[in-house]
Amino acid sequence: MHLTKEKFIKLSMISSIIILCIAIVSVILFGVQQFKIGSQLASVNQVSNLSHLLIRQQANLLSMLLVNNASTEQLTESLDAFAKEEFVLDASIYSNRGELLAHTSHFQNLRLTLGLNSPTQPDEENTQQIVEPIYSLNGIEGFLRVTFDSKYGKTTQSKIDHLFHQLYGELIIIFLAGVLLASSIHYFLSHYRRTYRKVTENKAVKVLKTKQNVGNYHRRRRRLNK
């Protein structure tokens, strides 16, 4: 009965420890997943804000050129310099009446860029367009249209995914190392307890034998004295 109760207590403790470990790991993984989602949203917003900021700065630069009646070559040169950005595919300048004033040297037809003239389904997810008004003191001078590659943001997300996959792997390794360490400590403690118990039992047996020998010796002396 005592052994059954002891086994039940041990099984209950082991089950509680396992449930607690699973709960802790679940909470950690949930927190990591939430942090991953937040990082992805932050990276998307960062890329979007950066692209809008660069386009707005370029529009301010083109505003000065349009006010000074710059030539088409100057506008094209400015657009080519802007198109060297990693995410920019092409850019065009339109007047406030919608007339095309200049475009990049590697300008592609808008319909061709978006795949509207292609018999296949256009890949709208890979390209996006931003139209930024070009302001001056006189009002709207024109519009800047920029086609940029949305894969730039996806590349950032893929890097974040890769980093978090590494983090998941490290968490699993840490968990397994903790299990191994706990098992090793449990083994050595159990071995130490068994060894200590044997030594204690041997000492008790020796003391008992010594007492028995002393008792026998005194009994013999009493018999001899009689």
Swiss-Prot record:
UniProt keyword list: Cell inner membrane, Cell membrane, Membrane, Transmembrane, Transmembrane helix
Major subcellular site: membrane
Compartments it resides in: Cell inner membrane
Superkingdom of origin organism: Bacteria
Keyword Cell membrane: yes
Alphabetized InterPro entries for the sequence: Uncharacterised_Smp
One Pfam family recorded for the sequence: SMP_2
GO cellular component term, pick one: plasma membrane
Membrane topology: Multi-pass membrane protein
Key word Ribosomal protein present: no
Transmembrane parts of this sequence: 12-32, 169-189
Homology family: Belongs to the Smp family.
Function according to Swiss-Prot or TrEMBL: When anaerobically expressed in wild-type E.coli K12 confers a hemolytic phenotype, but not in an sheA mutant. Suggests it affects the expression of the latent E.coli K12 hemolysin sheA under anaerobic conditions.
Protein name, per record: Protein AhpA
Species name: Pasteurella multocida (strain Pm70)
